[in-house]
Amino acid sequence: MIVRPFLLLLLAVVLGAPRVAAEPGVTDAEIVVGGSNSFSGPLAYTGEQITKFGVDLYFKVVNDAGGIHGRKVRTVYYDDGYRPQDAVANTKKLVEQDNVFAIIIPQGSPPVVATLEYLEQQKVPMLFPYQSSPVTRGRRYVFQGMTLSDRSSRMMIDYLAGTRKFKKFAALYQDDEYGKSFLAAFEKDLGRYGLRLTATESVKRGVTDVSAQIAKLHAARPEVTFLVLVPGPAAHALRERQKIGWTDTLMVSTGPLTDEKYLALATDAANGVEGLSLWPDPMTSDLKGVQLYRAYMLKYFPKNEPNRYSLAGYFAGMLFTEGAMRAGRNLTRDSLVTALESIKGFETGILPPLTIGPDHETQKQGFWVRVENRRFTPLTDWLKSE
């Protein structure tokens, strides 16, 4: 006679117990990640390559091999056109409607900075943003992708002022978070050598006429002129410099701009431009990881030519997969963070061995290149900034 009351009590306990909520974006069958990116506007090519031909390329390989602990990875992307306000709206939609597990490889300092606080409040991981502002450093739910501007600046100034002994520097920069973060870093690092920027000129995003800025910089007669721009204005600047016959300055491209396709927009006006490259040559490198990337690109996207942007996205997909595999079958946002923090000496076959420290940065190096006939000629081995 005591069995029935006991069963009723047990049933009440079970039904009354709080249920453990499923982790957003994670089911028995899949993991959903997404991002707001530029699929239109000045960085459309970059956005498409780092996501649809980069991250998604690596996830195709993973999914065809059985997924991550049996789960396939699915991606959701929205276009922000490099507009911060659209990036905010897209990111909220991804989190609140699509219930993504994490945001992966969003692009551009202004859009990324605009969404940063929201994602931190929601405790949603922002993984490997393709931007350079140091504002992402050391945040629990952010793992930075690209070499940050202050690290890039340190490598650039140490090489140009320290090794090559240039003394007079100027900068043409984009008037936003991207440009200003580099400008501040250049001033700080030049100060270590008792130097400063002797001239600076700013441009707005999307500008097509930079003739006035180039004329003013030319008049300052710098030995080195930094280009802290997106591709369109950079091409206009290089063509204008060629047009006025300005040959006695070394044009130096920042890492986010240093790609053959984008510098080729300036055609032969890009010859002789130097800069900090963040990725090995995707077409010719014999590094094992780059060879695999090329083989997978040929298999899955045979019409898409290998490039540094899709290689960066492929690398981001690799790091996400490594973190999620380490986190185990019981994947949560916090377990992913802990797993990524455990990466030490990870061999990717693409970049030097990776250790992720408290700063959550995944890239702290670059190497110096010069544009010759629309290709990069390496001038140094890896330069590092610790």
Regions found by a protein language model. Give the residues of each.
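Extracytoplasmic ligand/sensor domains, especially the bilobed periplasmic-binding protein
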Residues: 53, 97-201, 250-275
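Segments of small-molecule ligand-sensing domains
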Residues: 299-311, 321-375
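Extracytoplasmic/secreted proteins, especially bacterial periplasmic and envelope-associated proteins
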Residues: 45, 50-57, 61, 86-93, ...
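Extracytoplasmic "Venus flytrap"
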Residues: 25-56, 78-84, 107-108, 172-180, ...
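Extracellular/periplasmic periplasmic-binding protein-like sensory domains
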Residues: 238-313, 370-372, 376, 381-386
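Boundary at the C-terminal end of the N-terminal hydrophobic targeting segment
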Residues: 20-24
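Beta-alpha junction/loop-to-helix N-cap segments that form part of ligand/metal-binding clefts
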Residues: 26, 30-32, 46-53, 60-136, ...
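Bacterial N-terminal signal peptides
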Residues: 5-17
